[in-house]
From Swiss-Prot:
Positions of post-translational Arginine amide modification: R14
Keyword Secreted: yes
Keywords for the protein's UniProt record, in alphabetical order: Amidation, Neuropeptide, Secreted
Name the UniProt record assigns to this protein: Tachykinin-1
Amino acid sequence: GNTKKAVPGFYGTR
């Protein structure tokens, strides 16, 4: 899910 666009490597994959 794209919750945090600031950290797409971690939050982007979740």
